[in-house]
Amino acid sequence: AMDITVVMTGDEELSGRPLALSKKALIDAAKYADIALGFENGDGNPATANVSRRGSIGWKLTVTGKPAHSSQIFREDIGAGAIYEAARILTQFYTELRQEDLLTFNPGNILGGTKVTFDDQAKTGTAFGKDNIIAETALVTGDIRAISEVQLNRVKTKMQAIVAASYPHTSGVIEFSEGYPAMAPTAGNKRLLEIYSGVSQDLGFGEVTAVNPLRAGAADVSFTADYVDMAIDALGLGSNKGHTAEETGDLATLPTQTKRAAILLLRLQNAH
C-alpha cells in the first residue's frame, strides 16, 4: 500500500516568516516520506520537469565612510567614502563570483549619501546627500540563488572576504537573511524523472526532460529535499504570467498532467 500526504501551500512570494514555522507542515511530512512530488508549474513547458531548484536568500550590504568636503576625497586620512566602497564591493562580486556555475546574485536596491533610510518590508528608501560632501553611508540589498548549500556557503564566505577588504577609512558589513533551500539534482531525483518520462511516453505525451535550473526559481518542494530519497517538481497545472496580477491557469493542461501524475503514483506503488 502507498501512504499519501497532501500538503497545500500558498504562493512562495508571500510566505510567512519565520519559514521554519510557515513550512513546518511540509517539512514534517517530508521527514516521514520517501518521495516528494511538487505540483507547482515549472518553466511552462509540459515537456520538462524540475529535478533541481536553486535556493534563494537575501543579503544586505551596509557601508560606512568618513564624511568630509568633496575637495578632500582620496586624502590618506579621509579615504574614498561609502559610495566608492560600495561600488568596489559590487564590482568584485561581479568579477570574482560570476564564474560560479548555476549561481546568480543580484543587487536590487542601492542608496547612498550622507544619510539613508530603508524599509525592508516595503523595499523603499530615501537618501540625502550633497554633491560636495563625501558619502558617509551606502546600502545595497539583493538576492543570491545557488544550486546547493555547499555552493551557497562557499559564496557567502567569498562575499564576506570581499566586503572585509575595505578601502581606507571605510568599512562594510554584509548580512544574509533566511530563504528557500536548494534542491540539488541528486541521482534519486534523476531516476524519478526517468520514471515520469516513461509514463509520459507510454501515454503518448512524449519525453520529459529536466529544466535547466537557471530557468527555474525557488519552490516549496525544496523544503523536502533533505529528507526524501526522490523529489520532482512541475507536475501541476500549466499557467501564464506567473507571479503577476494577471496570472492564469491553463485548464487545457489539466487532463495531461492528471493522467501523468496518476500513472506515476501507480508505478511508484508497484515499485515498492
Locations of the language-model features?
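Acidic/histidine-rich catalytic neighborhood of metal-dependent amide-processing enzymes
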Residues: A1-S52, G112-A122, H272
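Metal-dependent amide/peptide-bond hydrolase catalytic core
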Residues: N41-G44, K66-H272
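Residues forming well-ordered secondary-structure scaffolds
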Residues: R17-P18, S56, G81
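Structural motif
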Residues: L61-G65
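A short, sequence-level motif marking secondary-structure junctions
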Residues: R53-R54, R75
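Short, well-ordered coil/turn elements that cap or connect secondary structure elements
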Residues: A1, K31, S56, E100-L102, ...
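Hydrophobic core residues within well-ordered beta-strands of beta-rich domains
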Residues: I57-W59, A138
